[in-house]
């Protein structure tokens, strides 16, 4: 499972999108990066494979994106990769 975390301006909690396939996760990540690099606000729709839910947002409100891999094994308690883990440290 691949996880995309999208950070919105003024919102401390990320929007999380799960993708089962690495290729689909890379495509979604690249579409967010391309939209951010364009410099002009665009609309973007992403689908979460885990729940089948969709999110639609304006890229002008995004300030970052991160892609991580979720392994099947248990992680260390109380730790998590990503933006929020860096802020808590």
Swiss-Prot record:
This is UPF0367 protein CYA_1023. Belongs to the UPF0367 family. Residues 69-89 are annotated as: Disordered. It comes from the Bacteria. InterPro entries: UPF0367. The lineage of its organism: Bacteria, Bacillati, Cyanobacteriota, Cyanophyceae, Synechococcales.
